[in-house]
């Protein structure tokens, strides 16, 4: 994904494609995918099937993002489906593998899978806010990356749905990739002072609350407490 968006920084370090080039980055991803498939084969058909279906969702989500919402479809609804497929699916699968290999009851495995999906979505929505609100030395990546690529995010979609005439110029700037660096900085300042940032944070907290509620069927334990704490860590992070 770093290669896809041509990001120079990820989590405070050089991205693989910047450090080693596109070819090595792609081949490394292929190797890791092959290695994980080999390891999962030892866990049986169900584990392999879960990986395949997760990868299917990831690819479908990427296709949906590239195509954009259908005519008449709510762009925000479309975006949240993309996020669920691209990010939620990965964390859901990780959580489900934990339940499967630990021998947890089926209902417990289903519960942590649902939690994983929701916390995965929350993680991406937090990234959307961080991309706008944080400085580079806080977030470990270049602020405004999505603006430069013209990729819709929670924050920009909240701006785009505004009917306030005062937002027209900003909406125009957000309607295409922004290549001029001075304009990127101008838009970042405008977004940081826009009500869409607070609205996006509220939506992020709603998803995190849904993740906590998903844990309701589980008994109180250190493990459940750790998952609750994960919700706080995801929404409070700056990188």
What name fits each language-model region?
Residues 1-239:
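All-alpha prenyltransferase/terpene-synthase fold signal
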């Amino acid at each position: 994904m770093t290669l896809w968006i041509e990001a120079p920084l990820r989590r405070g370090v050089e991205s693989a494609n910047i450090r080693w080039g596109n070819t090595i980055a792609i081949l490394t991803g292929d190797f890791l995918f092959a290695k994980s498939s080999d390891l999962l084969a030892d866990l049986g058909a169900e584990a392999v099937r879960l990986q395949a279906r997760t990868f299917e969702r990831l690819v479908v989500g990427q296709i949906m993002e590239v195509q954009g919402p259908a005519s008449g479809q709510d762009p925000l609804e479309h975006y949240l489906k993309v996020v669920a497929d691209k990010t939620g699916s990965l964390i859901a699968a990780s959580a489900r593998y934990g339940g499967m290999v630990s021998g947890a009851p089926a209902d417990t495995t289903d519960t942590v899978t649902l939690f994983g999906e929701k916390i995965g979505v929350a993680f991406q929505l937090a990234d959307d806010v961080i991309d706008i609100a944080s400085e580079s030395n806080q977030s470990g990546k270049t602020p405004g990356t999505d603006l430069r690529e013209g990729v819709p995010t929670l924050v920009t979609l909240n701006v785009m749905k505004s009917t306030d005439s005062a937002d027209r110029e900003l909406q125009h700037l957000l309607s295409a990739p922004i290549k001029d660096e001075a304009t990127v900085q101008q838009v970042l300042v405008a977004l940081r002072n826009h009500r869409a940032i607070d609205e996006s944070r509220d939506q992020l907290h709603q998803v995190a609350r849904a993740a906590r509620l998903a844990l309701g069927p589980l008994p109180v334990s250190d493990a459940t407490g750790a998952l609750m704490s994960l919700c706080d860590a995801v929404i409070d992070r700056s990188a």
